[in-house]
Amino acid sequence: MAHLEAKPADGTRAGGSRSAGRTGGRILADALKTQGVTHVFQVAGESFLGLLDGLYENRSAIRTITCRFEGAAVNMAEAHGKLTGRPGVAIVTRGPGACHGSIGIHIAQQDSTPLVLLVGQIPRGDMDRDAFQEVDYRNFFGGMAKWVTQIDDAARIPELIHHAFQVAVSGRPGPVVVAIPEDMQTDTAEVPDGRRHTVPRILPDPAAMAEFKRMLGRARRPLVVLGQGAHWTAEGRADLAAWLVANDLPAAVGFRRQGILDNTLPVFVGDLGNGGDPALFAKAKEADLIIAIGSRMGEPVTQGYSLFAPPRLDAPLVHVMPDGGELGRVYQADLPVQADLNAFAAAARATVSVEPRWRGWTSELRANRMKWSGEVPAYEGRLNVAAAMKELSAMLPEDAIVTTDAGNFSAWGVRFINYGPGQKLIGPSCGAMGYSVPAGIAAKVLFPERTVISMVGDGGFLMNGQEIATAFHHGVNPLVMVFNNQMYGTIRMHQERDYPGRVSGTALTNPDFAKFIEAYGGHGEVVQDTAEFRPAVERALAAGKPALVELRMNPDQITTRTTITAMRAAAGLKAKPAKKPDPKKAKPTATSRGRTAKAAKPKKR
């Protein structure tokens, strides 16, 4: 049983004699080790000093990554979950720290990412007094997290931490929040370590697989929709790809899920997310069988529920999800299948094979994808971002990791980069800005030998760009690619659509981003012309230090398909392009080699 009085973290009593057992902080750190944790992402706070001391004792097994902002720390843990399939772990302090970190909980919930957030808490005796930085975490996180608890007894730490990890990976994966009062961390208790959590693997019902085969045999225009990226294993993706190719089944991915399936396969037909191909959206409406595997068929994937209107589709729906609670929640499937996605892929590969009567359909969808991603439009301006992304696609190593932020800029990569079987793309499907830089740092911490590119807009970069300091602190070298169009692009697009020509609150004034990273000691590049892109990226990758490549875009080119000028013309307004920077008033900038040009001396008045 835990002693309720606080004791020094080394386990000694005030009189100098040594007490039995371990401190709560040490038990907690040991419990994380038992659950297989290798990294924790944190911003230090006095409310979890006991845990930090326990992590010091476990420093050979668990690497503590010190971040500069709690929101970024939780984003890093969320990226860990996406990249490994195992729960990422973040630690934040009470009150403000927890509030800052909540964005990562929202991302993990929307993206079905396993994550455990440990939150320092005020002493137990001060509860319900509106004490300094007191927050009721059950109420605060209850609508986003799968489970929220508080550990008040040090003896229960192994039990509750095991359960936290079990909940995070079970069914539909997601975030769990555990509050840890600071005085509990200095209590001592004699308690054995718990068991490591296990990932439940629900096998598909053979009868359901037989019915699925019958439904597939009747189809002429089937379409597979893939989702839930963190749930897939390498083996599962291999089984999935083999089954799709063997049956010539056209497969589209959900919003920011291109990493699930090799984009070079003849059955990959594109992305159903924001900024996707209108031709694919039109064809999706013609499908006579929808096979949703791991996709919740949410708002971005269905284009605001316009492609597939709930609750019942016009075409039969086979819906495969690991959590039975997700089946029938929005869409009433003709064949709901509760199964681990990897187990379903293996079973489908082994048992569901039919003579494809849709080869022409698949070929048409694939041809549309190749046209959409292969043809480089002749955009106005010196820098053709489409050509740059095609160049980047060819440059990426076979095991590259790309992280993306929220914003219109991301559509350029989605359209013009084809991800191979060993490459990964991760990003927030909920539109959370400020994700990509922390996610890229986490990726480089986890996989230091792999090339990591963090793509982010100018708006999103300045939400978490300070985490470049974290990359330097921990000796990792991601490459950040800033798409600079001097505005909150997505919001501006909506603004021009609904209130054409009435620009309000969406324009931005930016620093020299190359100088920004140079101030940290990194390598900066500025790209203003298409021909400058490849050499700049090559220099950045070879720099041996954190690097940043700024792409100075034509602000008028608001999406891959249209301009602000065209949107205003369609609204009946006189064409007036977005304001471009005045070179006479421009601040001194970095050259394409990252060196700083000298500014002209100001004239005397």
Spell out what each predicted region is.
Residues 42-45, 64-75, 90-97, 152-153, ...:
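Active-site nucleophile and cofactor-binding loops and adjacent substrate-binding regions
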Residues 182, 295, 406, 485, ...:
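Residues immediately flanking
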Residues 2-354, 360, 395-398, 470, ...:
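N-terminal alpha/beta PP-like core and its mobile active-site loop of ThDP/TPP-dependent enzymes
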Residues 118, 127-133, 275, 281-284, ...:
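Thiamine diphosphate
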Residues 25-29, 33-35, 46, 51-56, ...:
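Active-site diphosphate/adenylate-binding microenvironment
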Residues 2-19, 155, 191-193, 214, ...:
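Phosphate/pyrophosphate-binding active-site segments
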Residues 184-186, 408-410, 555:
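Active-site/binding-pocket entry motifs
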Residues 227-232, 378, 457-459:
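Conserved short loop/turn motifs at secondary-structure junctions
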